[in-house]
């Protein structure tokens, strides 16, 4: 059986950029390179879908999920905060069956894999661009995040026992 992860919507849920020590920080930056700490968190929630909400016709049955990719970046120069950037970027996804009987028969683990690995991989390029634009617009060099391997991040969290609770569809990497 084949399944498809379909993007229904994507949006900024929360975006914050703080530049608390300007303009002095720009003088400090000319003399020292900032230390940047980045954390990435992925979470998902199931969205209720009523039978009436399903389109009539031949569309396969689907489940809707909101996946949140949260990235926090903090830059410091000599223990002075240069900037703090926090973003929660979300996508609404459906999981559809490509079969004629429209039946979704995925294990809980397979659904988590789609939501916590495949979905954030789709969202990440948009988050990366938004952070680069925000830092650049604030007078700093654009912060270009390294590509995140969500598969490895998820597998490492499983090995550590994080996110094992059935109600906890999250992966956190600090």
Curated annotation (Swiss-Prot):
Could you give a single Gene Ontology term from the biological process aspect?
Answer: protein transport
One Pfam family from the UniProt entry? SecB
Compartments annotated for it: namely: Cytoplasm
Q: Can you tell me which family this protein belongs to?
A: Belongs to the SecB family.
Entries under NCBIfam families matching the protein: PRK05751.1-3 (NF004392), secB (TIGR00809)
Q: What does this protein do?
A: One of the proteins required for the normal export of preproteins out of the cell cytoplasm. It is a molecular chaperone that binds to a subset of precursor proteins, maintaining them in a translocation-competent state. It also specifically binds to its receptor SecA.
**Which HAMAP family does the UniProt record give?**
SecB (MF_00821)
Oligomeric state and interaction partners are given as: Homotetramer, a dimer of dimers. One homotetramer interacts with 1 SecA dimer.
This protein is called Protein-export protein SecB
Q: Which organism is it from?
A: Ehrlichia ruminantium (strain Gardel)
What gene is it encoded by?
secB
């Amino acid at each position: 059986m084949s399944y498809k992860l379909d993007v229904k919507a994507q949006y900024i849920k929360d975006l914050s950029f703080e530049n608390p020590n300007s303009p002095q920080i720009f003088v400090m930056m000319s003399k020292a390179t900032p230390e940047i700490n980045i954390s990435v968190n992925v979470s998902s929630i199931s969205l209720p879908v009523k039978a009436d909400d399903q389109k009539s016709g031949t569309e396969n049955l689907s489940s809707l999920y909101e996946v949140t990719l949260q990235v926090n970046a903090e830059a410091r120069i000599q223990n002075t905060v240069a900037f703090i950037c926090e973003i929660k970027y979300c996508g609404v996804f459906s999981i559809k069956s490509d079969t004629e009987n429209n039946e979704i028969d995925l294990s809980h683990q397979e659904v988590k894999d789609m939501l916590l690995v495949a979905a954030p991989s789709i969202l990440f390029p948009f988050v990366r661009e938004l952070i680069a634009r925000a830092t650049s617009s604030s007078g700093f060099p654009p912060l270009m995040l390294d590509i995140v391997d969500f598969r490895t991040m998820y597998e490492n969290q499983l090995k550590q026992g994080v996110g094992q609770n059935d109600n906890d569809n999250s992966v956190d990497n600090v």
